[in-house]
Amino acid sequence: MLKYDVIVIGGGHAGVEAAAASARLGVPTLLITLKPENLGEMSCNPAIGGIAKGTLVKEIDALDGLMGYVIDQAGIHYKMLNETRGPAVWGPRAQADRKLYKKAMYQILTNYPNLDILYGKVEDIEIKSSKIEAVILNNGSKILCQKIILTTGTFLSGLIHIGQKKIPAGRVDEEPSYGLSNTLKQIGFKLARLKTGTPPRIDGRTIDYSKTILQPGDKIPRPFSELTNIVNVSQINCFITKTTSETHDIIRENLDKSAMYSGQIEGIGPRYCPSIEDKIVRFSTKSEHRIFLEPEGLDDYTIYPNGISTSLPEDVQHKLIKTIPGLENVKVLRPGYAIEYDYVDPREISVTLETKKIAGLYLAGQINGTTGYEEAAGQGIIAGINAALAVKDQAPFMLTRANSYIGVMIDDLTTFGTIEPYRMFTSRSEYRLSLRADNSDLRLTELGMNIGVVSEKRKKIFTKKCEDIEKIKSLLNTLSLSTSKLAKMGIQVAQDGTYKTVLDLFKIPNFNVEQAIKIFPMLKETQNNNILQLLYIEAKYASYLTRQHADINLFQSEEAQFIPKNIDYFKIPSISLEIQEKLSSHKPTTIGVARRIPGITPAAITAIIIYLKTKYSDGSST
């Protein structure tokens, strides 16, 4: 009988990261997926990154994950979003060639040390004494294991809706999983339904681009991965069009035929990625909505019209598309659809992503209520790391709100749960100026090195980058000009007779890296790895970062105050019954987590701290 230490079920974005992370830690790992050609499949839009999402990708890369490196082998349109705003909200993004992305992912995974891939379907999980024993395939065979990571995406009781038509599926032309849904219910997990959707795909050869707006990418693509020196993939343009009043009229006239508005769909859809029906209803005063025409590949004429996700009947989809400028004669290749699926209340997992009910069972991705490739991948890498560390009897790896967006996401999910698809935003992070995309490796790579999940190649790159940062920082502190000379150059500084270093100049409003290079041409040679830009940001926002670091220190002190697992909140007399019940239900692991539970008052936190000091003066957390 086959036996592996870790088995990952599902080969989507969470699954591939989980499997690779577990394997990197030297643990024999098996990835079970339905189709070999769909490893890392982009089920919806052909893009990676975006605002906050791009930071997640950079954090995954910092831990030696796959997503950033793979998109650099397949990215055909790079763009830094929000670049006119502050660096805390910059969002690296890249359109992908779907075929190149899957090809690169397949090549990496099929040659990954300690990782085997099995093409099959898991029907059940065998559990004994609340511990994982094995997975059972649909052919009846059994594979023994210590840990299981479930990354089922939209496959748990998946149901596609196109108008009144219902198609049981986890994705187009792929059957859903009912067995695992039933298993989770029998164990006692709280399952609910969520919904997501995708737009129709159209033939780019039938688009009149003269009626659209050109959207070029960045002149020089900025890679996602620290392993990528330069993006060698050919770059292409995207285009923008918009809906019209006629489009809106057709949608309103057919709302009763939409699966979403006819009452046919039970699940709640993503608030921040609504269907076109939702947009017309919720934003009824808007006369138009933008649509981004995104190519799906270099040699693929399929276009993804980002902005018109829909569950309307096929004939209605055809009508509304032809009212959009440039799409009047377009050929629809595949209809859009909505899909419903089961998910588990994420409050049933710990911050390691291990379930509280079953030891050795981990959940990652949409099964935890998230939406998006990047959110799934971020959970996948953490689940994979922790499953492998548990096999090796090593301490778990936990990211926090203070050091990563991944930590923010996991804390939000495990503390508050979610009743709608959770998407990452910069606004969810209290410390977003410190948690930028450009410093992800400086925040996380050393943590990954400490547990052994980072390769030797990445270690060398990271070590050299840290050395280069110190050298360039020293140079910036050495190069200087007098205030009088700066004034002659038109740079507004106080005429105090002093000399200003480059780092001093970076703090001046509207002074930027390009000006610094113009004044000191030798700095052009230091632009490798965007180090100069990084030091510019650190200098520009130094006072804000100092204050934020003080806030982070306070946060970390509360996170370090552990609450014993066996605490009885009903024995703390000075807090209300309502709060006692909330705390007993949530089971917070630290004072910091307890403080973030809705409805928990500062007075209650003080009472808990006092109780812990008197009852558990030895600091025990067992």
Swiss-Prot record:
UniProt keyword list: Cytoplasm, FAD, Flavoprotein, NAD, tRNA processing
GO cellular component: cytosol
Binding residues for FAD: 10-15, 122, 177, 366
Subcellular location: Cytoplasm
GO molecular function, one term: flavin adenine dinucleotide binding
Pfam families the UniProt entry points to: GIDA (PF01134), GIDA_C_1st (PF21680), SAM_GIDA_C (PF13932)
Binding site residues for NAD(+): 269-283
Organism domain of life: Bacteria
Cofactor(s) demanded: FAD
GO BP: tRNA methylation; tRNA wobble uridine modification
Family: Belongs to the MnmG family.
Role of this protein: NAD-binding protein involved in the addition of a carboxymethylaminomethyl (cmnm) group at the wobble position (U34) of certain tRNAs, forming tRNA-cmnm(5)s(2)U34.
SUBUNIT field: Homodimer. Heterotetramer of two MnmE and two MnmG subunits.
Protein name (record): tRNA uridine 5-carboxymethylaminomethyl modification enzyme MnmG
The species this protein was found in: Rickettsia conorii (strain ATCC VR-613 / Malish 7)
Taxonomic placement: Bacteria, Pseudomonadati, Pseudomonadota, Alphaproteobacteria, Rickettsiales
